[in-house]
């Protein structure tokens, strides 16, 4: 697991209060991890803060799984 993936996983565990074992690459924030729309917005904001990036709303809407988040951040983080 990459450093970015580990950090993303830690943020998800912290913000959603789920077990680390539940946070798999294919886990959906809403369907598998129980996030509502507000939780998802808070996750995106935390990813932006943690990685020093800006995620436009149209891109944020496409980030629905752990792997989606990791891939976006790996592509855009400096």
Curated annotation (Swiss-Prot):
GO molecular function term, any single one: acyl carrier activity
Keywords: Cytoplasm, Fatty acid biosynthesis, Fatty acid metabolism, Lipid biosynthesis, Lipid metabolism, Phosphopantetheine, Phosphoprotein
InterPro entries hit by this protein: ACP, ACP-like_sf, PKS_PP-bd, PP-bd_ACP, Ppantetheine_attach_site
One Pfam family it belongs to: PP-binding
Modified residues (O-(pantetheine 4'-phosphoryl)serine): 37
SMART domains according to UniProt: PKS_PP
GO biological process terms, semicolon-separated: lipid A biosynthetic process
Keyword Flavoprotein attached: no
Subcellular location: Cytoplasm
SUPFAM superfamilies the record matches: ACP-like (SSF47336)
Recorded metabolic or biological pathway in which this protein acts: Lipid metabolism; fatty acid biosynthesis
PTM: 4'-phosphopantetheine is transferred from CoA to a specific serine of apo-ACP by AcpS. This modification is essential for activity because fatty acids are bound in thioester linkage to the sulfhydryl of the prosthetic group.
The Carrier domain, residue ranges: 2-77
Cellular compartments per GO CC: cytosol; membrane
Function field: Carrier of the growing fatty acid chain in fatty acid biosynthesis.
PANTHER family per UniProt: ACYL CARRIER PROTEIN (PTHR20863), CARRIER DOMAIN-CONTAINING PROTEIN (PTHR20863:SF76)
Similarity-based family: Belongs to the acyl carrier protein (ACP) family.
Protein's UniProt name: Acyl carrier protein
Protein's organism: Bacteroides fragilis (strain ATCC 25285 / DSM 2151 / CCUG 4856 / JCM 11019 / LMG 10263 / NCTC 9343 / Onslow / VPI 2553 / EN-2)
Gene: acpP
